[in-house]
C-alpha cells in the first residue's frame, strides 16, 4: 500500500501533441509523479466526441502514450493506460448521466463554444463530455486532478455530482465517491496560438501553422516561426497588453530556456522580430530534439510500448473496478452471488 496522494490526468489523441500540451500539462505531471501515485490516461473516448479519422485514432493513441514517456513520464512509477481499454469508464459515465440534472450540463461553457464550431454536426457525446470526464476522475478515487483554468468548471461539475447526487443521496456513514481537489496548472497553461496571441494553442485548430507539434521537423518549425504573427514594435515585451504575440513567444522561450521572463525581456529589449525568431527557433529545435529521439526509440518498439500499456491497464483496472463495484452496490444494482 502507498501513502502517496493519487493523481489522475490525461490528453486526447486527436492529433499530434504540441508544445502547449507539453509545457502546460505533461511537464507538470513529470514534476508531480515522484511524490504522487499517478494515473495517466490517453482519453480516446473523448476523441470521438467530434469528427475523427478512424484510420488515425489507434495510431494517435499509441503515439500519445509514447510521447508521454518521451517527455519524461516514468512508466515504472506511473500507470499509463488507454481509456477505452477499461469499460468501467463508460459504465460509470452512464450511471452519472442518470444522476445529473440536465440544467447543470446546460451551464457548461466549453460545450457552448465548441458547438458553435460544430454547427449541425454537434453530437450528444460532445454535450456529455463533462460527465465522461467526471467518470474518469471519480473512478480512480483521485485526491488531485491537475487542470488548466479552462477545465476547472468540468472538475467542479465532477465534485458536485459526486457530493450532491451520489454521496448525499446514497451514501450512508461514508462517502461512496472521493471528492477530488484541483491542482491548477499555472506554469505553461496559457500557451497561445502562433497566429493569434489571444487564442489558446489547440490540436483542433485547422491551421497547422498555429502550433508547434512535438514531432515537427526542424524545417517545419523554422517555417512556422517565420510565419508566426508579429507586430510593428521594436524589442520584445511581456506585459504590454497591445502585444499578445510578444508575450506568448517570450513565455514559451522562458519555459524552454529556463530563464526568467524579466531577464529575457531585458536582454531582448532592443532585438527585432527577425533576430528574435531565429534565436527562438533554435531554442525550440534544441529543446525538442531529445524528446523526438526518445519517441523514435519507443514507437519503433511497439512490443515494449504495448507491454507498458498492458501493465498500466492492469493497475488502473483494479482501482476502477473496485470503485464501480462500490457505486453499483450502494445504488442498488443486482449482484450475482459468488
Swiss-Prot record:
Superkingdom of source: Bacteria
InterPro entries for the chain: aa-tRNA-synth_Ic, Rossmann-like_a/b/a_fold, Trp-tRNA-ligase, Trp-tRNA-ligase_bac-type, Trp-tRNA_synthetase
Residue ranges of the motif 'HIGH' region: 13-21
Binding of ATP, residues: 12-14, 20-21, 148-150, 191, 200-204
Enzyme class: ligase
Record key words, sorted: Aminoacyl-tRNA synthetase, ATP-binding, Cytoplasm, Ligase, Nucleotide-binding, Protein biosynthesis
A GO cellular component annotation in the UniProt record: cytoplasm
Compartments it resides in: Cytoplasm
Binding site for L-tryptophan: 136
GO biological process: tryptophanyl-tRNA aminoacylation
GO molecular function, one term: ATP binding
Protein EC: 6.1.1.2
A UniProt-annotated Pfam family: tRNA-synt_1b
Recorded catalytic activity of this chain's protein: tRNA(Trp) + L-tryptophan + ATP = L-tryptophyl-tRNA(Trp) + AMP + diphosphate + H(+)
Motif 'KMSKS' region boundaries: 200-204
Biological role stated in the UniProt entry: Catalyzes the attachment of tryptophan to tRNA(Trp).
PANTHER family cross-referenced by the UniProt entry: TRYPTOPHAN--TRNA LIGASE, MITOCHONDRIAL (PTHR43766:SF1)
HAMAP family linked: Trp_tRNA_synth_B
Subunit field text: Homodimer.
Protein name: Tryptophan--tRNA ligase
Gene name, Swiss-Prot/TrEMBL: trpS
